[in-house]
From Swiss-Prot:
Keyword Cytoplasm: yes
Alphabetical list of InterPro entries matching this protein: aa-tRNA-synt_IIb (IPR002314), aa-tRNA-synth_II (IPR006195), aa-tRNA-synth_II/BPL/LPL (IPR045864), Anticodon-bd (IPR004154), Anticodon-bd_dom_sf (IPR036621), Pro-tRNA-ligase_IIa (IPR002316), Pro-tRNA-synth_IIa_bac-type (IPR004500), Pro-tRNA-Synthase_IIa_type1 (IPR023717)
UniProt name for this protein: Proline--tRNA ligase
Subcellular location: Cytoplasm
Name of the gene encoding the protein in the UniProt record: proS
Keyword list, A-Z: Aminoacyl-tRNA synthetase, ATP-binding, Cytoplasm, Ligase, Nucleotide-binding, Protein biosynthesis
PANTHER family xref list: MITOCHONDRIAL RIBOSOME PROTEIN L39/PROLYL-TRNA LIGASE FAMILY MEMBER, PROLINE--TRNA LIGASE
Entry keyword annotation includes Transit peptide: no
């Protein structure tokens, strides 16, 4: 098929928009693959849709290989099912809520567990109806507080979400492993790097969860890799607790004047210059800082949060939470939010300090009224610290945990660093972006929504569920980010919007294009009346892997072939070049080319 640029909905831009946060995102906007229409909201243009559909069709192909059945649900839902499952409250401000003219509650679905469960409840009545795996590719909606990086974190995004339904846990594990194998094939075919990490189920619920993360410094997910090759999302990583220490002979804690000290570096410098520690250098890790957060109470399902720490906070009505962490650490907010779900927390701002005179900035420590204290696992009984004394310009030296100060609970929410010790040895900390997530949901939604079938003995039995998601629009953005240089995009052949990009420089040789009509390839022909420089610049920006130059420098059937991947240029007869492209396409693992169900078309 031949598409002429003069007949195409197409425009490129020479400069990145001011809001561009990454090179690949900038090229997607400049080349006209997508257009931003609002904060975290994008329109898909013809070039972008062609690539997106190829990603979707690869996913569809691999889903068919594991007998998954495609359906399509609406994005708009009544809140009834979400209230029944408990997620109407669990999601808090992260979902778009709205009311109809009768004041009924609705939402734009962030995921579709409830809808799939209800559908299967109405269709499946017997064990003979199981197992089943059903999926859709649909837009989702989340009210991101700070949308960023284009399609990587947007308010509207495309996902493939699949759900398995089995009679028992063994069947659930088999369905889970089948999806996991399919995901590996999908990401391998898309040529995207990934690491499989153990993860937290979060608001999705369930017991077993794994993420597919694409390693990149752009990522907002932290994961750790252990010496034996195991990988964990930071949210589920377990810090080794410090050893209990006998403090029966430890000296008494002392108050120390620390005028002007408001940070850990200030405190370390002051201590090392005070002359109190002869022969010893004080490090940040010798100090215990208290990071103060304001607690925001969310509606808790049935008054029971299912989280003992949160239950304590609710029962005693605390307004603030103080995290006691070593001075060389910070609070990992994602770990903290997971540990305290369904509560949300916000760092204490100036207003908090203005309303609470006892909160002394720079010298906050244990013992404040109205604060629920959570200590890092390293704060073991008998460990000695330099802490804030809750008085201006005063800290305490040699404060012993369990003797001089106490806390309400131990909570593992500190930041993790490369070299930290784990039960598997030292860890390496990396960053990544989630591209896929697998959950063994178990009976959470089946029990909540009454999904049961009759077993062989005629008894009603709750159905075991699994949930499996892939971020389609996020994959699109990441693949663009990975496959670009300073001049533009460089799509893998399996995903490129066209097989060939013809730069027509000589109208006298335009008849060569006729030989491309029936070759079975998708061809973009730049027939615009613009300068060769503009055409070449746009060809590099768009990123089709093979650029064919038809001009006066070649004769007869010869054309110049420009390989966008390595920038090599060769002169070949047009038919030979076409045959080479077709052969490479036909040996790429696809056995259904030109049958109408090709996973890349």
């Amino acid at each position: 098929m031949i598409t002429k640029v003069s007949d195409f909905l197409f425009r490129t831009f020479r400069e990145d928009p001011a809001t561009t946060e990454s090179r690949g995102y900038g090229f997607l906007l400049r080349a006209g693959y997508i257009r931003q229409t609002g904060s975290g909201i994008f329109s898909w243009m013809p070039l972008g849709l062609k690539v997106r559909h190829k990603i979707e069709n690869i996913i569809r192909y691999e889903m068919r290989q594991v007998n998954a059945i495609e359906v399509l649900f609406p994005a708009l839902f009544s809140a009834d099912l979400f209230k029944q499952s408990g997620r109407w409250s669990e999601y808090g401000d992260d979902i778009f809520r709205l009311k109809d003219r009768r004041q009924g509650d609705y939402l734009l679905a962030p995921t579709h567990e409830e809808a799939f469960t209800q559908m299967m409840k109405e269709i499946c009545t017997s064990y003979r109806d199981l197992p089943r795996t059903v999926y859709q590719i649909q837009d989702k909606y989340r009210d991101e507080l700070r949308p960023r990086a284009g399609l990587l974190r947007s308010r509207e995004f495309s996902m493939k979400d699949a759900y398995s339904f089995d009679l028992d846990e063994k069947g659930l594990r088999q369905s889970y492993e089948a999806q996991k194998r399919a995901y590996k094939k999908i990401f391998d075919r898309l040529e995207i790097d990934y690491v499989i990490v153990k993860a937290n189920a979060g608001a999705m619920g369930g017991s077993v969860s794994e993420e597919f993360l694409h390693p990149t410094e752009m990522g907002d997910d932290t994961f750790v890799v252990t010496a034996d090759g195991s990988a964990f999302n930071a949210e589920v990583y377990v810090t080794l607790p410090g050893p209990a220490i006998d403090y029966s002979n430890a000296p008494e804690a002392e108050d120390c004047e620390t005028p002007g000290v408001i940070s850990i570096p200030d405190l370390v410098n002051h201590m090392n210059s005070s002359g109190r520690f002869i022969g010893r250098v004080i490090e940040s890790s010798d100090c215990l800082k208290c990071l103060l957060f304001r607690i925001e109470y969310a509606e808790v399902q049935n008054g029971n949060p299912g989280n003992l720490v949160v239950k304590k906070i609710l029962e005693r009505g605390f307004e603030y939470i103080g995290f006691l962490v070593p001075g060389d650490r910070n609070v990992d907010l994602k770990r903290a939010q997971v540990a305290l779900s369904p509560l949300t927390i916000e760092p204490a701002d100036n207003r908090v300090f203005e309303c609470n005179p006892s909160f002394v900035r720079g010298s906050i420590g244990p013992g404040l009224s109205g604060v629920f204290y959570c200590a890092d696992p390293r704060v073991s009984s008998g460990s000695s610290w330099i802490i804030g004394a809750n008085r201006p310009g005063v800290h305490r030296i040699g404060a012993i945990a369990g003797r001089d100060f106490s806390f309400d609970c131990t909570l593992d929410v500190s930041s993790i660093k490369t070299g930290d010790k784990s039960e598997w040895g030292p860890v390496t900390v990396k960053r990544g972006i989630e591209i896929g997530h697998l959950f063994q949901l178990g009976l959470k939604y089946s029990n909540a929504l009454g999904l049961k079938v009759l077993d062989k003995d005629g008894y009603n039995k709750a159905v075991f569920m699994g949930s499996y998601g892939i971020g389609v629009s996020r994959l699109f953005a990441l693949i663009a980010e990975k496959n670009c240089d300073e001049r533009g995009l460089k799509w893998p052949a399996v995903l490129a919007p066209f097989d060939l990009h013809v730069v027509l420089l000589s109208s006298a040789r335009a008849e060569l294009i006729d030989s491309l009509t029936d070759c079975g390839l998708d061809v973009l022909v730049d027939d615009r009346r613009v300068s060769p420089g503009v055409k070449f610049t746009d060809a590099q920006l768009i990123g089709v892997p093979k650029i064919i130059v038809i001009g006066d420098k070649t004769r007869g059937e010869d054309v110049e072939v420009w390989d966008r991947a390595n920038d090599q240029r060769t002169v070949l007869p047009l038919k030979e070049m076409i045959q080479g492209v077709i052969q490479r396409s036909d040996t790429g693992g696809c056995t259904e080319r030109c049958t109408g169900v090709c996973p890349t078309r």
